């Protein structure tokens, strides 16, 4: 039968020191593991925060850059539109000045009576063809009545020669064209319901509408944005 010997105080002290050293070593190793893990987690979290901040900065910069681009585009578009409107306005002013100058010179055609009679003949004959009626009324300035009668006689003969139809034209003395008119005539048919305004002012307005595209092209060149032409 074995005997159990009691440990001496020295032996107990040694065992305690061994256990203490072991526990201390375990604690230090555990502490190192915890520190390493904490450092790793800190590094990961730090990297995540840096990445988030970087992304936020990049996003904010991209947003500001996009806003700056849009603002620049809007500014360019606004300036281009203002410039285009100024150019169009200047062009329209030039066209208006041209027609105003033409309007101011309309009355000069009546100064040469021979030339004016030729014009009246053409205007009256044109009205005869357009109306194609046997009886018509001509309105004119009182000062032009004699010239109009002569021109109407010539136009009636030409109309008869070309169409083999007679046309009787009388002057409406009760409704003359205002003396302030530059000249020309108004032919009335359809029992007073239809009229053709061949006064100089009306012809200039008609010319303005019909010749405007050609004048724009002649003065300002081809419009690259125009798809349809008159």
UniProtKB/Swiss-Prot annotation:
One of its GO terms (cellular component) is membrane raft. It is found in: Vacuole membrane. InterPro entries: ATPase_E_C, ATPase_V1_Esu. It is a peripheral membrane protein. Keywords: Hydrogen ion transport, Ion transport, Membrane, Transport, Vacuole. One of its GO terms (molecular function) is proton-transporting ATPase activity, rotational mechanism. Pfam families: vATP-synt_E. Subunit of the V1 complex of vacuolar(H+)-ATPase (V-ATPase), a multisubunit enzyme composed of a peripheral complex (V1) that hydrolyzes ATP and a membrane integral complex (V0) that translocates protons. V-ATPase is responsible for acidifying and maintaining the pH of intracellular compartments. HAMAP family: ATP_synth_E_arch (MF_00311). V-ATPase is a heteromultimeric enzyme composed of a peripheral catalytic V1 complex (components A to H) attached to an integral membrane V0 proton pore complex (components: a, c, c', c'', d, e, f and VOA1). Belongs to the V-ATPase E subunit family. This is V-type proton ATPase subunit E.
């Amino acid at each position: 039968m074995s005997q159990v010997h009691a440990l001496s105080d020295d032996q107990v002290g040694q065992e305690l020191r061994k256990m203490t050293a072991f526990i201390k070593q375990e604690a230090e190793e555990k502490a190192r593991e915890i520190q390493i893990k904490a450092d790793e987690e800190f590094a990961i979290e730090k990297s995540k925060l840096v990445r988030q901040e970087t992304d936020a900065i990049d996003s904010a910069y991209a947003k500001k850059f996009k806003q700056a681009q849009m603002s620049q585009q809007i500014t360019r578009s606004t300036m281009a539109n203002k410039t285009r409107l100024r150019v169009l306005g200047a062009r329209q002013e030039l066209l208006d000045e041209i027609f105003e100058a033409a309007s101011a010179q309309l009355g000069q055609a009546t100064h040469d009576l021979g030339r004016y009679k030729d014009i009246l003949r053409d205007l009256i004959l044109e009205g005869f063809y357009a109306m194609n009626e046997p009886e018509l009324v001509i309105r004119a300035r009182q000062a032009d009545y004699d010239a109009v009668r002569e021109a109407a006689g010539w136009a009636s003969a030409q109309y008869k020669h070309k169409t083999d139809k007679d046309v009787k034209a009388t002057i409406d003395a009760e409704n003359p064209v205002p003396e302030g008119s530059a000249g020309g005539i108004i032919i009335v048919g359809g029992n007073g319901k239809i009229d053709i305004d061949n006064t100089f002012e009306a012809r200039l307005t008609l010319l303005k509408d019909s010749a405007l595209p050609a004048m724009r092209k002649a003065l300002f060149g081809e419009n690259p944005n125009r798809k349809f032409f008159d």
